From Swiss-Prot:
One of its GO terms (cellular component) is nucleus. Residues 301-378, 764-783 are annotated as: Disordered. It catalyses: Thiol-dependent hydrolysis of ester, thioester, amide, peptide and isopeptide bonds formed by the C-terminal Gly of ubiquitin (a 76-residue protein attached to proteins as an intracellular targeting signal). Gene3D superfamilies: 6.10.140.2220, Cysteine proteinases. The dominant gain-of-function large grain1-D (lg1-D) develops significantly enlarged grains. The gene is UBP15. This is Ubiquitin C-terminal hydrolase 15.
Amino acid sequence: MLQPRESDVPVLFVVFIVLPVIAYFLLGRWHDAVSKKARVSVLAQRAAEETFKVETMATPDVILPGPSLRPMPYMRSAPSARPEYHECATCHGPAKTRCSRCKSVRYCSGKCQIIHWRQGHKQTCQQWNGFGTSSSGGLPPTENTEQMPFLSNLNSPLRGSDVHLHDMDFDTMSEPSFVTTDSYNLDTSPFLSDRSNMNKPNQFLHTSENGAAIGSYEKNDYSIDGEVPSSEILSGNKGLNNSSGSGENCGNRDVIYPLNSVVHQPNNYAPEIRKRPKASITVYESDKGVYLTSDMISSGEGPYASAAESLQRSNSSGNVTGKGNMIHKKPPYPSGKVSSSQKSQEKVLTSHQYDGHEKNPHNKNEQRSTKTAVSTNSSLQGCNGISKAGASKVEALKKPSKFLKTSLVGLINDNKRSKVLFPYEDLVKFFQYEVRGISPRGLFNCGNSCYANAVLQCLMCTKPLMIYLLLRLHSKDCCSKNWCLMCELEQYASTLRESGGPVSPSRILSNLRNIGCRLGGGSQEDAHEFLRHLVMSMQGACLDGLGGEKQVEASLQETTLIQQMFGGRLKSKVKCLRCYHESERYENIMDLTLEIHGWVESLQDALTQFTAPEDLDGENMYKCGRCSAYVKARKQLSVHEVPNILTVVLKRFQTGKYGKINKCVTFPDMLDMVPFVTGAGDNPPLYFLYAVVVHVDTENASFSGHYISYVKDMQGTWLRIDDSEVQAVSLNQVMSEGAYMLFYMRSFPRPPKIYIEKGLSSVPTCSKRHSSKSSKGSKQDLNHTESLFASSDQTYGIYDFRPDNGYIQDQHAALRTRNFYHTDDAFADSISTDFSDATSSEWSLFTSSDESSFTTESTRDSFSVVDYGDNAGLDPISSIFGPYYAQDHPPGSFASCTRLSPSNPQTRYFQENTGFVSDSSMPAHLPGNVHRGRYPDRACSSSAEPPASANPRSVYGRYGLSREGFVQTSGFCQM
């Protein structure tokens, strides 16, 4: 064996250790240098772009001179050349930037700016306000530099007293022009108005013959029949010396003149112009001349208030008050924002002022992007008080109208409503309407596929999903070229419309790989895992048309039909026991998995254990962000938003041991989730059982066994489905099974979170008609209930999917689908629900726990349906369940339950198949109404009259009709 020489060790050390370390260090330095250089180049490029943008839009301070208004021939001026070199105030080198505050000092770098600032510039630097003392001040950069072609002219100093006003975009103008007259020597104010009256670059001067000129400015030329040149706007024969124009022929003819001329204004009163307050100007034209007034003159301010007196002495039959309004924005300001009042004025002006004139087609896009409000035409009221009328109209324009607010709110709501993938109103119909012509069929076992058969049977009995599949709403918009799960489920649902033998789910099972599911292949699988894959795949199929889950925002994903049915939220609250800081987190769920070990004997016990506080200690300590350490904490889970289709999974399988918990866990067929919900707007979440999945085994193990399902069809009959075998069973048999998965359907669907947050969920018609104030008397409540029942045929309907049924459209429903019509049977006016016992307390109707009983004195403060009905001034039963179900009721077997309250006895009738409820204390035509009462203390019998010898301890009973005859489904009544 070769032995290494001693001289090789240092060489190996240098080669394999020292050199790699040195190379790593050098590469790191080189990488840092390259990154720094790239970062510097990026910053320099950004600074250069910003500087170029600032230089492009830089303007000097401009004070428009003089009080004379002379028209000049229309001409376009070439842009002035800007200086290419600027000197740094510190090092006198080429300057690239300037002071962002005063806009008057330039620098070559940020370092020079800091040095100059510390040398004393911070004492002399003043905020730039549009009329500063610097000659190099300007406007800040805006988002769109193409909207300001006039800035090139303003960068050059003024020569003489000519100021070019044509092609100016007054949307971005820093200070407006001053227009005065020589005859009055007026010191007028700028063309100003409220900020809500501006932003339009395409403005014009709208004048009427011998009338007013509504002053605005048009950037583009108009094609006008008989166009009048701009030099004739103010005729030379009509001087400005006469102030007593009669204006008898005001408003005879309207003409639009392009105001693209050059205005000469001697700067005689420039100092006073700066000191004048902002005011609106009225420009009008009469037979004697053209006049300009302002509210400053009418108020007696300034040395030229006598002009207002001469103006008041003029008698005329009418006038047009025009306001040449321009709003200037001082930097910084955003671009492209249009106020609400401006939009309303713009609509009015578009219909009045642009009527009969053809616009320049090249300006359509610009007019759409940036719009402004121009003052509207008004009727001629006389020349007296022109300035006062103008001032009042300016104030009126500042206040948006109520109609405008309403229209804007409606527009916003319409836009928000469009961001919903499946309308909530249609989901309400899927929950409310009755379904006919559908009956479950068996499924062939395609090799250990009982888990899939049981889950598919439960999903096909999910009412809203079943209606959605039968209406083929997905396939109408499906754009998938490959195999689609939703389209396949629609094909399977269509087979349920026809009577026959079992069908095969082989097409679904053979394509499980296409939906990312690793189940199948003939092996035994978990039904819960298959359900999760199926629900998530249906959610993905709903989003495929929009580009997939990654392309759709999270808030929009919650508005799909699958998410609205199965989606919910859990709330996790952790409280630090050291600093008592509380943190909350929310988690989206598709089902609710509950532990059943220990003392749990019912579903309510499992929910109580799930929502009980848990101490985090030992190895499970909580890391508090405020304490910055692992501390003891207390954690509590609660259901923040319960899904509309609540899937409860009882964890019977033990992980690691392959064992199964075969203990008996009772469950109700009407579940009250009020004690376990923290959401404020989620009351009362009442759920009805409609499907159960049971795992049957003989070896008490999780790796073997068989899945069967119990489902309630659309007519309310419970069926036991074992693959291809379907048989009717009683409710008692369903309640005695060891359930693995429970499917509950909400009594009324909860709206999505986006509806609740933005207040877009419209109250259904039935809820609006059913609501009443608690202050009304019993007679008013009764009349209100009668009107509700009388109109119920317009609120509820039936989806009839029988093969012989034709296409019927509903004129009152918003959803236009096939096989739909309103209920018109004998019991259409009744309000029904499916009641059952399923309770462990003799006084409870809605939960099996004594804590939720609403008839005992000790728990009266807890929530109950009767309390809810009392607070709303409604009947306790019909107020909760009335709006939810309206089914027809074929003749069947009824049992009555009579209770005696301190006032009068009432009798209730119950039928298992249809859930029909009636009250003998109410009129005969109101079978769905139940009188409100808190102290039921009589028994039930099989007749409408209370028996003489009734057990006073019996409270509630019901009998259903099966093939063998009467089957008692409640243990609280004795026959």
